[in-house]
Amino acid sequence: MKPSAECCSPKFWLVLAVLAVSGSKARSQKSPPSIGIAVILVGTSDEVAIKDAHEKDDFHHLSVVPRVELVAMNETDPKSIITRICDLMSDRKIQGVVFADDTDQEAIAQILDFISAQTLTPILGIHGGSSMIMADKDESSMFFQFGPSIEQQASVMLNIMEEYDWYIFSIVTTYFPGYQDFVNKIRSTIENSFVGWELEEVLLLDMSLDDGDSKIQNQLKKLQSPIILLYCTKEEATYIFEVANSVGLTGYGYTWIVPSLVAGDTDTVPSEFPTGLISVSYDEWDYGLPARVRDGIAIITTAASDMLSEHSFIPEPKSSCYNTHEKRIYQSNMLNRYLINVTFEGRNLSFSEDGYQMHPKLVIILLNKERKWERVGKWKDKSLQMKYYVWPRMCPETEEQEDDHLSIVTLEEAPFVIVESVDPLSGTCMRNTVPCQKRIISENKTDEEPGYIKKCCKGFCIDILKKISKSVKFTYDLYLVTNGKHGKKINGTWNGMIGEVVMKRAYMAVGSLTINEERSEVVDFSVPFIETGISVMVSRSNGTVSPSAFLEPFSADVWVMMFVMLLIVSAVAVFVFEYFSPVGYNRCLADGREPGGPSFTIGKAIWLLWGLVFNNSVPVQNPKGTTSKIMVSVWAFFAVIFLASYTANLAAFMIQEEYVDQVSGLSDKKFQRPNDFSPPFRFGTVPNGSTERNIRNNYAEMHAYMGKFNQRGVDDALLSLKTGKLDAFIYDAAVLNYMAGRDEGCKLVTIGSGKVFASTGYGIAIQKDSGWKRQVDLAILQLFGDGEMEELEALWLTGICHNEKNEVMSSQLDIDNMAGVFYMLGAAMALSLITFICEHLFYWQFRHCFMGVCSGKPGMVFSISRGIYSCIHGVAIEERQSVMNSPTATMNNTHSNILRLLRTAKNMANLSGVNGSPQSALDFIRRESSVYDISEHRRSFTHSDCKSYNNPPCEENLFSDYISEVERTFGNLQLKDSNVYQDHYHHHHRPHSIGSTSSIDGLYDCDNPPFTTQPRSISKKPLDIGLPSSKHSQLSDLYGKFSFKSDRYSGHDDLIRSDVSDISTHTVTYGNIEGNAAKRRKQQYKDSLKKRPASAKSRREFDEIELAYRRRPPRSPDHKRYFRDKEGLRDFYLDQFRTKENSPHWEHVDLTDIYKERSDDFKRDSVSGGGPCTNRSHLKHGTGEKHGVVGGVPAPWEKNLTNVDWEDRSGGNFCRSCPSKLHNYSSTVAGQNSGRQACIRCEACKKAGNLYDISEDNSLQELDQPAAPVAVTSNASSTKYPQSPTNSKAQKKNRNKLRRQHSYDTFVDLQKEEAALAPRSVSLKDKGRFMDGSPYAHMFEMPAGESSFANKSSVPTAGHHHNNPGSGYMLSKSLYPDRVTQNPFIPTFGDDQCLLHGSKSYFFRQPTVAGASKTRPDFRALVTNKPVVVTLHGAVPGRFQKDICIGNQSNPCVPNNKNPRAFNGSSNGHVYEKLSSIESDV
């Protein structure tokens, strides 16, 4: 047959190829890639077990199938191992090796590392020497070991020591490779740990030297720590332990911890290894050799499978050990990356870069007394689990065990023992806690599981245990009891802490263990370290605030003492000091005091002190005495302390509530008969304790009832109390007090504030007949003696609620607390009494020396006063010895003058009984006056009741003692400055207001320059020009040497000045005062008077203008008076009326009409030379015409003169103010100084300082009835403007009136229209007090022999003005005395000396001889008893009878009195207003 053509066709070969490929794919699916792995076992390994392990079908899910070659070897030398592995590579084409041996030779691991680095074959050492620690592996090696690294084993060692609180240790190593890593790992761990490690020694032993054991012994003797870490080989460890045993480092109290390298094969234990040796080893029990072989095969297979999956190839098998291709190196490095990260069956089998397992299975083994390794712990997932909660300290049987390490049991019960968990960060207990083990009781528990949990204990009893252990010097292991609580005997067996001690599982029991008789039978108790007993806790009830809570801050003694000091002592002391003080309310040592005025009573003193204590803003009257002020000041300081202390404690007592306990004690009816209450009273306790035992033994019925309400623990009982399930909880007092203090919200309290029943104490239970009891007792007593026990109690047993209670409850301030302030009040009273005595001594004895009397110089008081004044006002004080010693300086001294002024004002204010009259002087004075008392700053004068009375005749020589004193003192002084008194009063005592009715006539030439205290630079003229001749020379000689002002204030009479002294309180005067009317335009002057302020300054202005008008000398056509620098003076006063910025706008009135109708008369007077002061030579005799008078109108004073009077006056020059004829005044002198001609006065008027007589005002008064005509003759040549009385009366109607006050009385009487009822008068018993020796007794009496002016006057008067209250104001008599000796402002040398010495004036009364005044050659001849005839005209009722109103003002031309004026020192007529300002200037 012939072959077919189809067989050779191309289609045929294609089918064959497809079939071939399909066949190859089928074969590939049936047989996956495989990897050859050799398992080499050295020694007596169980091959059957290994075979079963790798034959199991555990790798079917992998893409690579392991092809295992099982090889057994007996030789362990390096040559045999290398030859056998190389043969397997060439014959079996293996790609990995799993090596296991049963030796302790670490050299096998080094050989395997070398083979792997040369052949690039992965080798796994899983057991024996191949798995031992190896340091410094080759970088290209693929050798991996089933075992922990050096660092891992060092960490486990530290965890073991931390578990049992072994913080003090030492390290011993040899030069075996890896020792540096071991030491460095331990150092770095303890440095970065929170545990307080103490590494004492690090010993490096050199085992290569053959110098015997001496060197190693010397090194080991340095070790003192109880824990020693050893790193070396097993052979080296055998030698080291032998030497350590010789030096006593392997006995009881020393613990050695070694790594797995030392332990080696656990089946063989060298005899040198000490009992109790601890080793960290690979887990041989739970991770045996078959499991390791299987995991080794799985690691290589899984890595190859992962490589195949990612790269589609696996490493090619190696055919020889002697050649290595680059391709093989690449594949081996790639496989190494997969070998490091392997996970098999959910287990992490990864390796580190050094070839060690990342998560090895380690165990802690202990060499027990049977010389076998016992597994006591496990290290898994970086956590340590130990079998023993108290480390069993083992020692050789030949040695006796020392009892210095004790096992102590405790019970959790705050605050005595508080159990906490370990710190989650460090896994250890904090520094203030102690590790304590808690057993785990579980039915399903296996032997491998640990039987305890590590906890941390702290508390009051734990701190006591720590202190006792340091004192007695023992160590301990602490664990928590699990069998019961404190301890109770059940069926003859004790449980709890007492049971642990009885069974000798613990040496001691520490905690809240109550000492009782039953327990003391089986154990010994130490002395009690805290007192306790049985207490009852209840829920807090609602409290109430006591009604007397506001009194609680102070005790009753303090309240009583305060009121006693207030009402009896302090108030009485202030009143007494004030009453007897020289300047107090109730003393009248100063004559200016108003009798019957305000007084300081005992009631006011109590009211004042009461207001100071309680800060009451009620009106009180303050004392004035220095002593009483000191007392009140100290009382105010006491009030501050008292009130501050009261306020500080008041809030605490006001919020403090009183709580009522529900039960009073264990014998309370609620406990003994709980069912009698509705609902029944519920109470219970924690069973199996001393509290239950006590109740059972003493209260059987109570114990039976409370069984159903017993609680499992204290926390459960507290919760039941808060929720209302329980009414009372009976338990240990110390525990309940702590719980009450720490309760949230402080809702739970113990009855009776911690009342204790059946008192006992807590103690430490010790084994019976133990040697520790005495040492423990002494240690506890030492804690009490050192005060440490009190510190522990304050730290642990004091709760928050106790602190809050202490903060709220404030103890009462008893008398001891407030004693200091009462002592202060007593000292203040003593000081006040001393001050009171010193005040009177100074006032009555030493005051005069401080005034300069003793030294003759200005006193200290004067110097200080003037020094302060000089500092404030800048006034220089001249205290030259020559000046101050002169009599003139003494009388010109401002200080002396002011003192006299004050003395005079006081005497004026206290007049009572005028010349024996039953009426008081105060009846004539108005209380509402603006004039104030100098010393008291009060209004001291009252208005008159306008009743007339008969003035009793005065004695002729009433003031003879003053006259005698003046004569005796100044009789031999020469004449000096006769006008100085007049000039002094011109400058300093000016009227303040317009008090009388007058009109403005003639030309106004008033010179009132601006006020200044500086002396004027005006050229002086002799003051003795125009003085009278020998008739008054003796009088001038008597007074000329003393003046109130020095020569610097003297000047021309034609330029009358208006000075004020340094103590003046006058106001600025307004007005245009130029004297020449020809140079003044009418409209300009009228405009200057428009809308001037209607204030006190206006009244002052009118007084100045009128006074200047009255002072203006007579004028003649050829004698005119001119001012210096008139334009400047006029501009100055025009500026006074211009509105100024920042000044108040006064109410203005238009006064232009006052001068409107008089302007023409002024011009005529100016042309004719006439005026108010017309020369007497121009008067005619024997005619009815009057020439040279004002406006041709006869003045009222002219009507009082007869023809004979006019004839007498026409022949010569007369006094300006009185009828005295000036015989020694020549016409030559008058011609030289015409300005002084019309204002010349007699010596009597000069001495009195009178500017005018009061009767001069009669020329300005309007008469309601026409006066009788008086024929007056005058020269026809001088008659210019004759006018009849009718024309004069008509002209007066057009005049505007101004009221001017000329005296103190008239000023006060200005406000009489609004006066109220008459004030109280001075009692009659004070009538004679001011009469004898008073310089003002003359004010309300007339000279002897005169009954009234109306009967003796030769001039017709308007009779209806007499004693008519409604007739208008009348010019009253000046307050100044009528005689020169009565003038208090004219001091005498004797007066001055008496004032300096602080004594009364030594005036003496002499009997007056009838007619002596007519014959005596001295100035007494001037005193006359003739009546002074005055006619008063006015629209205002007079203050006194007209017969006692002596005139103080006269017409400047002709006097209205025929008789010469008596030397009247009181006729000045000036008023001192607001004397308080004068006093303040002093």
From Swiss-Prot:
PTM summary: Phosphorylated on tyrosine residues. Phosphorylation at Ser-1303 by DAPK1 enhances synaptic NMDA receptor channel activity.
Glycosylation (residues): 74, 341, 348, 444, 491, 542, 688
Positions of the UniProt region annotated as Disordered: 1161-1194, 1269-1301
Topology within the bilayer: Multi-pass membrane protein
Phosphoprotein keyword on record: yes
Basic residues biased stretches: 1290-1301
Outcome of swapping residue 127 to A: Reduced zinc binding
Subcellular location: Cell membrane; Postsynaptic cell membrane; Late endosome; Lysosome
Superkingdom per UniProt: Eukaryota
Gene3D superfamilies xref list: 1.10.287.70, 3.40.50.2300, Periplasmic binding protein-like II
Start-end of intramembrane regions: 604-623
Region spans: Interaction with DAPK1: 1292-1304
Biological process terms in GO annotation: action potential; associative learning; auditory behavior; behavioral fear response; behavioral response to pain; calcium ion transmembrane import into cytosol; calcium ion transport; cellular response to amino acid stimulus
Protein name as catalogued: Glutamate receptor ionotropic, NMDA 2B
